[in-house]
Design a protein with these regions (language model features):
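Catalytic core of membrane glycerolipid acyltransferases/transacylases, capturing the structured
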Residues: 1-36
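Non-catalytic C-terminal accessory region of glycerolipid acyltransferases
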Residues: 40-147
């Protein structure tokens, strides 16, 4: 399935080095201020979802950690609000990519997709439960050293 993906990215993770700055230009990225989420960002996310676009939200609030952290309720909020599924995705091995690239070597990055977790309007009442379910699904797909 070829469909564009919009990624949520923290403003403080916006790369400053020229060789990292190309990614947001080629991929759909919505920058978000972690300290104070702007209404315009929320509206933009709602708009993407209503257009049936794919939105990627890292439930931990970061994509830079090599260990699984506690999930935040952002992805659960949008899934419950729009009654759309959450597709848990486990990504590991990324920490080896840049050092390997510097040595002109290949490395493996593993991406595993889990079964959809169907969110309903009832989940709005208990977002943390939906978040726990999502994080547990991700945890089950990761090797132990990443948990």
């Amino acid at each position: 399935m070829k469909k564009p993906i919009t990624y949520l990215m923290a403003e403080d993770q916006n790369p400053l080095r020229w060789y990292e700055a190309w990614a947001p230009m080629f991929y759909g990225v919505l920058l978000v201020n972690r300290k104070k989420i702007q209404p315009s960002t929320i509206k933009a996310l709602h708009k993407q979802i209503k257009k049936n676009e794919i939105v990627c939200i890292f439930p931990e609030g970061t994509a830079l950690s090599t260990k699984l952290k506690e999930g935040k309720n952002g992805a659960s909020f949008f899934a419950a609000r729009h009654e759309i599924p959450i597709i848990p995705v486990a990504i590991f091995g990324t920490e080896k990519a840049l050092p390997a690239l510097k040595r002109f070597k290949r490395t493996n990055i593993n991406i595993t997709f889990g079964e959809p977790i169907f969110a309903t309007s009832e989940d709005k009442k208990n977002l943390s439960e939906l978040t726990k379910k999502t994080m547990n699904a991700i945890r089950e797909m990761l090797p132990e050293e990443y948990c």
